[in-house]
């Protein structure tokens, strides 16, 4: 279940599981969000077909912001994923701030366990999953995990 946002506008810290239908109902409340969710659904279908079982969603899409720029996502790296399929779907291309992903899906995808060095106010090496669990001020926030088996 997706918890209510805190007064800061962010989810409470933690990893909050949700089904796709709940996620869609919770966040689909403006035309821009609807557009982004359609792109996310297309990307998730590709990820699921490539063998990915879950993704983590973070960033401003999880806040009350009516028109977020994109949806920030990360997924678990696994050796048995269908790498050619992921590449063909632009889900491995992080060049130019994930330009191909943003153009095709309105989303950014990274490996959850990939390290980021000294990113923003967080002066340490952290993973994308850890990064998504901090706001721009470095304070803890929540993320949503979607099981891809819950897609309709």
Segments and roles (model prediction):
Residues 74-76:
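Short hydrophobic/aromatic beta-strand micro-patches
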Residues 70-72:
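Acidic active-site catalytic centers that drive phospho-/nucleotidyl reactions
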